[in-house]
Each structure stands twice: as C-alpha cells, then as structure tokens.
Amino acid sequence: QRSLVGSEMCIRDRIQIVQLHGTDKKLYELVAPLVMSPEVLKQNYNYPFRTSEEYEWFVALDNKHVVGFVPVEHKKYECVINNYYIKERNVDTLKLLLEKVLEKQGEESSLTAVSFVEDRDVFSELGFLEDKVWTRYVKMKKNR
C-alpha cells in the first residue's frame, strides 16, 4: 500500500462521505442547491442530473458543505457512474468518492463509468479500463 501525500491525508481527515438512496429526502436537501446551480450545470456541460429508486448517491461533505457527489445507477447487469460533480474538479475528492463507491460495490457486478476526459487518470489509477473515448467523455469499465 502506498503512503498518502500531505494534501491527501488532510482531505481524508476533513471529508466525510455519506451514502444515500436515490429518493432519500436528505439527498434532495444536500444536492438540490448544486444540481440547479448554473455553475455546476456548466461544469456538467449543461446535462441535467437525475435520480430514481435505482440510484445510490455518494456525497462528499467538508464541514457540512457538499464538495462533490457520485450517483451510481444499479441496472440489471451492471452499475453505472454518470454525471458526477466535484467542486473545483478536486482530484483528491473524486478519488475519495470513487474509493468509497468501489468499497461498497464489492463483487456485486461490473461497474461502468462515463468520466470527463480530464478525470480519466483518476479512474485508471483505481483500475478502470478505457472502453470508448469521445470528445468530452471516456467510457471506462471496472470488472469484478
């Protein structure tokens, strides 16, 4: 196991990851201000965020403020990460969220992620393999 660098240790001490069901009232309270924010939507290329019974959300909190979230959709044969948000594109926050997703995922099924091109290295570092590359996104898979 590799040692943590200073910034990573600091963020791990500060950030709390909460897991919430896709229709949990607390989820709406936490993410509603962000998913309707023009700045956040712009970072997501104006693509809306969505949720349903089939989603599990991993939300990163720094002093009770949301600094990122990764929704995971549970489909019949796979789970899918699509349309996530990381404040200021902080790599350490993204990594922390993805590690929690992988920890909870277990051996359940394969995991597909549609990541931003800028984040492909973080996903690769955690064992995701590139499947398709588009202009803004990379479809990546992590098999169990």
Language-model features: locations:
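Single conserved hydrophobic/aromatic residue that forms the stacking wall/gate
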Residues: 1-11
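Conserved active-site alpha-helix within GNAT-family acetyltransferase domains
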Residues: 116-135
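Conserved GNAT acetyl-CoA-binding A-motif
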Residues: 105-117
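Conserved beta-strand in the GNAT
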Residues: 59, 64-73, 80
